[in-house]
Amino acid sequence: MSPRASFLNKQLAKVAVIAALLAERVDGVWHVRSLGAPHIGQRPEDELISAFAERLAELHPTLVSFNGSSFDLPVLRYRAMIHGIAAPGLTDEYFKRYSTRHVDLCDQLASFDQRAKVVSEVW
């Protein structure tokens, strides 16, 4: 079985942890701080998703991920729907392929060519 074929189906995935850093440039100096990494041992999945979506709506950050547009963000959206969470922060510009609000490094490295993605080789 190929690594790509054995990868977890997005519709079956559950959120176990959401970790994020916030980088802000103030007077030419970058400041990086953790937004935390709560996990399901601390809070239920619906609270993790709701809190993250609220932070996105509040901060309007540019997201940087690796394969986030193909896996992480769709999983968050599916799980929000399953839990009945209104998550406007998860339906914004982050899902548009060439968005300036979400930089997916996997897509960038592959020049947006699905055949050139390195995900299957990483796992």
Please provide the spans of the model-predicted regions.
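Metal-dependent phosphoesterase core characteristic of DEDDh/y 3'-5' exonuclease domains
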Residues: 13-42, 54, 58-123
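A conditional alpha-helix N-cap/helix-loop micro-motif detector
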Residues: 42-49
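Short catalytic helix/loop segments, enriched in acidic residues and glycine
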Residues: 1-15
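Alpha-helix capping and helix-coil boundary motifs
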Residues: 1-3, 44, 118
